[in-house]
Amino acid sequence: MPRKTWRAALAAYASPSTLVLLLLGFAAGMPYMLVFSTLSVWLREAGVARAAGMPYMLVFSTLSVWLREAGVARETIGYASLIGLAYAFKWVWSPLLDQWRLPLLGKLGRRRSWLVLAQSLVILGLIGMGFCDPQKHLSWLIAIAVVVAFASATQDIAIDAYRLEIAQDTQQAALAASYMSGYRVAALLATAGALYFAEGFGSTGFAYKHSAWTGTYVLFGLLMLPALATTLIMREPPVPLRTQLSAARYGFTHQLASVFVLIVLLVSVPAMFTQLYNTDFASVLFNGTSWMDLLLEDRAFLRAILYTLLTFACLSSMGRRGLAPVLTPINDFIMRYRWQALLLLGLIATYRMSDTVMGVMANVFYIDQGFTKDQIASVSKIFGLIMTLLGAGVGGLLIVRFGIMPILFIGGLTSASTNILFLLLADMGPNVKMLILTISLDNLSSGLATSAFVAYLSSLTNLKFSATQYALLSSIMLLLPRLLGGYSGVVVEKFGYHNFFLITALLGIPTLVMIILQWNREIRTAKTEEPKQATSIDQP
């Protein structure tokens, strides 16, 4: 790809699309933080060991604070955190957004119609949550929160698809930086800001006042209106004819059926193995129990058979036909990249592993080092947010200027190497100057890496299935880092912070190797295509 001038790179931020993505990013960050309750505060206050691996950075979890202040049991608050699964599995219903246009609202276009529906549900849901007192209407509050979570996840899908369709690959980083800026500002406002508002309206840990939380949630619901207005004003991205034809391939009933079959499959497979593990096969092998007696007496064996039948039903020819709307985008990705898809999926699954695993224990590390909460809030939260946004902006600028792969490599290298700064900080105690330096470089590299990675993911998707493929790839991006992050506390307890930060830095090496391999392959591909293009131009 030919390099562009700095003026052309800066021009990427001057387009109206960047302002649109800024407002849409604000709309995406607002409901996520207001609804997605975490357990970090509960676990830390209850004295649970660090092996729980919960990110202390989500201490400003608004819904959990509200529920706890209202006197709701910790166990119930813990179950309420499962609402966040809507964001993890949003790829399940993403084909609906690719292949079905809503009635009535469909006149706005495929992307805008889904955005209007999702944003309207979020606004009404947040206001409705505000009028539900957890002390009296807890079930209603949780039910509405579930609706808001699914609507918010649907909004995320539509925004990502819209972003992919309005700009070229090299411009995606600038749009991603703008989106990230709006998202992070909304996240800060919806967490710390919401708590300040609730306390300002008269609700504290010592004197719960429902009307204060009503005012807070109604206010934040109304703050979604500018995003809804933006959706109504902005233009629908152009849809190629081939995409329109593919959208009509599956009917709405078939698409709903595919979502149902996929959910059954996702539930049945792990449940099948769990019940087989719990079945008492030893009684048959060593005690002479018949299989019929085992079936009649062991409920786990009966459930295992049931889940096995459901799994095979989903994988049968009829089940695969039902899954076609979901499998088609996946098959398209595999057919386009073939064996290379393994390398790409490995790169995607590990790119954010180094900084994500480290980030799980970062704020707990600050406390254990002896930093005050004011220092953590000022340096890590506020100053760190500024450096992250600066890094994202610089990343978008550099990608337009130099291309995606060089900046993707630099982002991966700096994200892993800055973990060494935490290693040095671990030997220095509560050194504020070193903390500022560490946070500056770490968040700057994180922002740069994020913008580069979003641009790279965007370049891998097919516009026919932009919503589905991007939702799936972004889920893969988070899966392995979050799983490993769950054991970060165990590593710290066993090996200490010094070795923990060294290990997280080394986790970035496989990713860098895969980036180099993919980068070299793209260079070879570009060299082989140049003579073909020159030959086609010379032909009369």
Task: Indicate where each model-derived feature is located.
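C-terminal transmembrane helical hairpin of 12-TM major facilitator-type secondary transporters
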Residues: P406-F453
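Intracellular juxtamembrane helix-capping segments at the cytosolic ends
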Residues: L39, A153-A167, L448-N462
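Loop-to-transmembrane helix entry/capping segments in MFS-fold secondary transporters
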Residues: R74, D169-S178, K373-A377, L463-L473
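C-terminal ends and interior cores of transmembrane alpha-helices
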Residues: P103, W114-K136, L413-P430
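A late C-terminal transmembrane helix in Major Facilitator Superfamily
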Residues: L460-K494
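Helix-to-loop junctions at the C-terminal end of transmembrane segments
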Residues: F89-K107, L390-I407, V492-E493
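Intracellular loop-helix junctions on the cytosolic face of multi-pass helical membrane proteins
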Residues: M1-S15, G130-W140, T154, Q168-T350, ...
